[in-house]
Amino acid sequence: RLIVALDVPNILQGLELAGRLGKAVSFYKIGLGMLTGGGLALANELKAEHGKRIFLDMKLFDIGATVEAAVRGLAQYDLDLLTVHGDPQVVRAAAEGKAGTNLKIMAVTILTSLDRADLDANLIKPGDLREITLERAARALEAGADGVIASPQEAQRSALCRKPRAS
């Protein structure tokens, strides 16, 4: 499934791009950088007026109560996907916040821009980056994430971490 990133500075440019793409695209990603440019209004318009699906890439990370409240508020926009950092306590809070909605919580395991030196500087445990990513993916899924965001390098191996389907 194709998800097009609306990495533009404001709602007008986002609507213009979505208009040019028309029916060829049914799913859009709106990131943190677009938030102050009318990102939530853009999400609302694309969803309500044009029937598009929305992936809000916020990578939320805070104390549980704050994440839960933020997700509860964002769920009112009838979003399809929302990213949070994959720490289990963050994922659990997000799952609580989305309760009773169709919003899917996607966990970000490790930012793709980070390398081993960055992880060391941030006191992230030693080890192979791919193995840590898989471990974090498994923990996020156990904590209630609906899915995991991974780099192409980890995506194939992350498929091993899928939640078991209820029989």
Per-range role (PLM):
Residues L6-H50, G64-A70, L134, P152, ...:
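Conserved alpha/beta-domain cores
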Residues R1-D7, I54-M58, D118-K125:
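Glycine-rich phosphate-binding "P-loop"
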Residues S26, G51-K52, L79, A145:
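Short phosphate-binding/catalytic loops that engage adenosine nucleotides
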Residues V4, Y28, K59, L82, ...:
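Conserved, mostly hydrophobic/aromatic
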Residues R1, K47-M58, T101-A107, K163-S167:
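Short beta-strand/loop segments at the ligand-binding rim of alpha/beta enzyme cores
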Residues D62, T66-A166:
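Conserved anion-binding
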